[in-house]
Every structure is written in structure tokens, then in C-alpha cells.
Regions:
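Alpha-helical transmembrane segments
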Residues: 8-17, 39-56
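Bacterial N-terminal signal peptides that target proteins for export
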Residues: 1-9
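Non-transmembrane, membrane-proximal soluble domains of secreted or membrane proteins
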Residues: 25-42, 68-368
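Membrane-water interface of transmembrane alpha-helices
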Residues: 56-71
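C-terminal motif of bacterial Sec signal peptides marking the signal peptidase cleavage site
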Residues: 19-22
């Protein structure tokens, strides 16, 4: 009896523990913006839809167990087995219909998230570059000329276009109460529209494991009224220190960081999405070397001051759409250097040189 009692108590304890573990705030189902609301509605719809299917199956299963169970009054039951094309077609179409019923709203919600919310699509979105760097988030406001670390202020009732990229490892940008996650990857820029309808502070984080500092890569989204946001932006720009290339390169060194605020943005001298190898030069500048995290005896000594000059880049490209500021990495007449140019860039440079030489020859021949 004691063994049975112990087993029951252990089972009850594990059950209570499991129930308590689920008592946290389900932020995904507590949306504070139109993007998150659409995704929350999709989740609830999918759960209810699948519960109906599961309950239907269990009801049918129970009926079959009860109706066709072995009974004393029916000793020999011979099932009437024969083929039925109608039934076969019917139960083949059922899963097809289920997939369609789930796929249509899912696809609609996904595509709706690729554009500004319809309720505020007439408003000009605020554009914020969100750059992931182990293990911190760097937010750049090109219009307001502000840069923040591990927190971002946004106005309410206005679409926000986050341009996501990563300076190093792949991460995932996620603010559960404002919208679903999207990957931030090196060498590319991903667009993510979000919007907050209520004033407040919302928690954001990296949702993709990327090493020992993963748990610390969190940030706050501070939603303010339009008036308060403009006031904050004006005061922040006037009172914060100017971000320099030295400061930015130091931020790229792996490690956690407190909240920081700067005037200006790093987009003035580099866009890591267009120059994904920039981070490695930043490592060299401060003497950082990647080590084995599983070996406590391997450490990397980081210099307080840069040991190499800044990497020269030029950011002037009017051909790109608004805020897509790409560095002109290859300059006219500049040679190839493995620390600065990729193979495809070298090929492009050679093609340009050949084209220029051909045009010059054609011009000279025409003059003669």
C-alpha cells in the first residue's frame, strides 16, 4: 500500500509542478498591436479547429469501442467488409480540407505581416535598423539620428519598420506582444513591420540560440505617444554622446551590454548587412580572438583602445531606396584586399575595369 501511495503522491507532485509551470503570462495571446492581434487570432483559430478534430476522433473512437466490444450476448460477430469508393474518396478529402482550412488563414496572416498594418497604412512608418551583435541589440534611427543599445523607443498608433540584420551569428528578433519573430542574418536585411496600440514597455529577445550569452540578449520596447516620442528623440539627440567608429567596433565584440544611448548612427560609416566581414576587422582592432567556450583555460584578451586604424568605407548610394544606405566598399582604382573585399566584389571590380578600358579604347578610336 505504501508503494502505491508513494507512486500516487509522486504522480500528483509532478502533475502540480507541470500545472504551475504553465501559470506564466501568455504574452503571445495578450497582443498589444494589430500585427500581434492577427497572429494571436490565427493561433486561437488553429487551436480550436484542431481541438474539434481531436474531440471528433475521440468520440468516434469511443463509439466504436463501446458498440463493437466483445459481449456475451453476441458470441460470433462477422463484420460486413466490402470496398466503397465513395467512402474512400470522402476520407481522403477530409485531411485535404483540413490542410486547406488551416493553410488559407495562415498564408493570409503571413503575407499581411509583410506590409504595414492596414489600419495605419496611410501613415509614414518610422524606420529603425535593428542589428544583432553577440549578445546585444543595436537600434539605429536614421531619420532621428539616434542609436540605442538593448532598448528601443517607438510611437504608438504608427507602423514601425524594423530592418533586421546580424553582425555575426544568426539570431531571431521577437517581441511577443507586438508580433512574431523573424530571423536576423549576416549579409542581408530582413523587413519586419510591428505596431503598438498601447503605451507601455514590452519585452523583446533573441529567440534563436547563439551561444553562452543567449539568455542575456534581451531588450525593451518602450511605446510612447507620438508627442512624447518626438520629445524623447529631440532631447536624446541633443544630450547623448556621438557614436564613433571606435565605439561601434567595440560594441561588436561578443559580450553582454547595459542600455546605452548615442547621438548619430553607425550607418554613417558602415552597414554590416552590405559588408558582413566588417565584424572580423573590428575583432582585430581590439585584439579579440574567438575561443572555445567549453574550455575555461582559453581566454581572449580585449584591448581597451583600438590597436588598428578604422576600416575605411564610404556610404553614399542614392540609388537605394529610403534608408538602404550601403557602403561603397570598392573605390575607384582601389586594389583588392582580402580583409575588405569578397570574391564577388573582386569579380565586379575587374568587370568594371574591363568595361572602362573598352569604352576608353572605343572613344580613342572614334577620335582618331
Amino acid at each position: 500500500v505504501s508503494k502505491v501511495l508513494k507512486s500516487l503522491l509522486l504522480t500528483a507532485l509532478l502533475g502540480v509542478t507541470g500545472l504551475i509551470s504553465g501559470c506564466g503570462d501568455l504574452t503571445v495571446l495578450n497582443p498589444k498591436g494589430p500585427v500581434a492581434k492577427g497572429q494571436s487570432d490565427l493561433i486561437i483559430y488553429s487551436i480550436i479547429f484542431m481541438l474539434v478534430i481531436v474531440l471528433t476522433i475521440f468520440v468516434l473512437f469511443t463509439i466504436m469501442l463501446v458498440k463493437y466490444r466483445e459481449r456475451k450476448d453476441i458470441s460470433n460477430y462477422e463484420p460486413d467488409m466490402h470496398g466503397s469508393k465513395k467512402l474512400e474518396i470522402f476520407w481522403t478529402l477530409i485531411p485535404v480540407a483540413i490542410v486547406i482550412a488551416l493553410a488559407i488563414p495562415t498564408v493570409k496572416t503571413i503575407y499581411a505581416g509583410e506590409e504595414a498594418p492596414k489600419v495605419t497604412s496611410h501613415k509614414d512608418p518610422i524606420v529603425i535598423y535593428a542589428t544583432s551583435a553577440d549578445w546585444k541589440w543595436i537600434f539605429s534611427y536614421p531619420d532621428e539620428s539616434i542609436e540605442t543599445v538593448n532598448y528601443v523607443n517607438i510611437p504608438t498608433d504608427r507602423p514601425v519598420l524594423f530592418k533586421l540584420t546580424s553582425a555575426d551569428t544568426m539570431t531571431s528578433f521577437w517581441v511577443p506582444q507586438l508580433g512574431g519573430q523573424k530571423y536576423a542574418m549576416s549579409g542581408m536585411t530582413m523587413n519586419l513591420y510591428l505596431q503598438a496600440d498601447e503605451v507601455g514597455t514590452y519585452k523583446g529577445r533573441n529567440a534563436n540560440f547563439n551561444g553562452e550569452g543567449f539568455a542575456d540578449q534581451r531588450f525593451d520596447v518602450v511605446a510612447q505617444s507620438e508627442k512624447d516620442f518626438k520629445k524623447w528623440a529631440k532631447e536624446t539627440k541633443a544630450s547623448s554622446p556621438v557614436i564613433t567608429q571606435d565605439i561601434y567596433d567595440r560594441l561588436l565584440i561578443p559580450g553582454s551590454s547595459k542600455k546605452k544611448t548615442y547621438s548619430g548612427t553607425h550607418l554613417a560609416f558602415v552597414d554590416v548587412a552590405a559588408d558582413p566581414e566588417y565584424v572580423f576587422y573590428a575583432y582585430k582592432r581590439f585584439g579579440y580572438e574567438m575561443t572555445n567556450p567549453h574550455n575555461p583555460n582559453t581566454k581572449s584578451t580585449i584591448s581597451d583602445e583600438p590597436m588598428l586604424p578604422v576600416r575605411p568605407v564610404t556610404v553614399t548610394n542614392p540609388q537605394f531606396e529610403r534608408h538602404d544606405m550601403k557602403p561603397q566598399i570598392i573605390k575607384n582604382g582601389e586594389g583588392y584586399h582580402e580583409d575588405k573585399h569578397r570574391e564577388d566584389e573582386m569579380k565586379k571590380m575587374e568587370e568594371d575595369i574591363q568595361t572602362n578600358e573598352f569604352n576608353k579604347k572605343e572613344s580613342d578610336d572614334a577620335g582618331n
